[in-house]
Amino acid sequence: MISKDHRMLGELLAKQLIKNTSPLATHLFVTGCVFPDHNPLTYIRGLCMGHPFKTHFLFLSYPEIQRLCSKLENRKRLYIWDYYTLGALTHYVADAFTYPHNEHYTGSMLDHTKYEHDQLHRVFEQYLTKDFQAAGYVNDDMKPLGEFFSE
């Protein structure tokens, strides 16, 4: 996914799930959704593991997903920085559901980039904007994310 798509997804999820929190919490969540694509350390990790262009593939990012989950488990409430962690977790999980981030993908990095920019981005623009909202998937009845941690 391209950064713009991670941002759109983050903003939609924030609108639906991060209600009644500070604007800073929303900003940190959306930043977490985007930042892994801009963090050079994530690419160095892939290079060190012998997969320089597969850094966000599920088989390489799974340990990071586990690490982020372990930071959040057993929480009674969310602290401000946890929103960034949730955003980063969302980034890796979203990437894991895209074809070029799957270990069965055999295309080149150029094919990967072309797919994300041409095909996937068009789908995200269509479904995460007007069509998604018009279909009734966006509503005000969803439980705010913070309530899951206060039960």
Predicted regions and their residues:
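N-terminal membrane-targeting hydrophobic helices
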Residues: 1-151
